[in-house]
Amino acid sequence: MVQAWYMDSDTTTDQREEHQLDPPVPVSIDEVRDKSGVLYWKLNADTYEQDGELEKIRKDRGYSYTDVIEISRDKLPNYEDKIKTFFQEHLHSDEEIRFILAGSGYFDVRDCEDKWIRIQVTRGDLLVLPAGIYHRFTLDKQNYIKAMRLFVGEPVWTPINRPADEHPARFQYIESLRQGIMV
C-alpha cells in the first residue's frame, strides 16, 4: 500500500532519502486526498492490460494519450538536468497522471497549509496530481523508475515554477480545495 508522510525541512541531506519528521508523522492516502486533492489507485502492474481497471479510469477521466518514461542515469538523456527540473517546485495547468510500472520514487506535494507531504510510489501505484498543485518529484535510493504518463489529448508537460500563485490553474485549484470538490 502507498505510504505518505509529512517531510522534514532538511535541505542538506540527499533528496532521495525519506526525509521523515522525528518522530514520523504518517499521512493516510485519504488524508492526502482531503488535504491536497491528489487521487490514488492501486493497480496490478502485471495484468493492467487485461483486467480493464486502467482502461476504466482512462475512459472515466478522459485520458486519451499515454507514453512511458524510464528515469535512470543510463535510460534518460540529460539525466542530471532532468532530475533537477523534476525536483524544482512547480505546478502544471493540467493534471499530472503517473502509473508506476517498475521501480520507485517520491512525489512531494503541498497540502492545504503549504506543508510538504512525501508520497512514496512503487510498482502498481497510480497517482493523479490536480492541475495547479505545487509539487516535485525525485527518485529514491534505487535511482530507477518506469512510469506510464497519461494525458487528456496531446501530451503537455510544461512546468510552471513557483511562485505561480497568479496562474489560473492555481486559482482554480485553491478554490476547489476550499469547496472540497476535488475529483
UniProtKB/Swiss-Prot annotation:
One of its GO terms (cellular component) is cytoplasm. Its cofactor is Fe(2+); Ni(2+). It catalyses: 1,2-dihydroxy-5-(methylsulfanyl)pent-1-en-3-one + O2 = 4-methylsulfanyl-2-oxobutanoate + formate + 2 H(+); 1,2-dihydroxy-5-(methylsulfanyl)pent-1-en-3-one + O2 = 3-(methylsulfanyl)propanoate + CO + formate + 2 H(+). InterPro entries: ARD, ARD_euk, RmlC-like_jellyroll, RmlC_Cupin_sf. Ni(2+) binds at residues 90, 92, 96, 135. Residues 1-21 are annotated as: Disordered. Fe(2+) binds at residues 90, 92, 96, 135. Keywords: Amino-acid biosynthesis, Cytoplasm, Dioxygenase, Iron, Metal-binding, Methionine biosynthesis, Nickel, Nucleus, Oxidoreductase. Binds either 1 Fe or Ni cation per monomer. Iron-binding promotes an acireductone dioxygenase reaction producing 2-keto-4-methylthiobutyrate, while nickel-binding promotes an acireductone dioxygenase reaction producing 3-(methylsulfanyl)propanoate. It is found in: Cytoplasm; Nucleus. Its EC number is 1.13.11.54, 1.13.11.53. Transmembrane segments: none annotated. It comes from the Eukaryota. GO terms for molecular function: acireductone dioxygenase (Ni2+-requiring) activity; acireductone dioxygenase [iron(II)-requiring] activity; iron ion binding; nickel cation binding. Pathway: Amino-acid biosynthesis; L-methionine biosynthesis via salvage pathway; L-methionine from S-methyl-5-thio-alpha-D-ribose 1-phosphate: step 5/6. Pfam families: ARD (PF03079). Belongs to the acireductone dioxygenase (ARD) family. Catalyzes 2 different reactions between oxygen and the acireductone 1,2-dihydroxy-3-keto-5-methylthiopentene (DHK-MTPene) depending upon the metal bound in the active site. Fe-containing acireductone dioxygenase (Fe-ARD) produces formate and 2-keto-4-methylthiobutyrate (KMTB), the alpha-ketoacid precursor of methionine in the methionine recycle pathway. Ni-containing acireductone dioxygenase (Ni-ARD) produces methylthiopropionate, carbon monoxide and formate, and does not lie on the methionine recycle pathway. This is Acireductone dioxygenase. It comes from Ixodes scapularis (Black-legged tick).
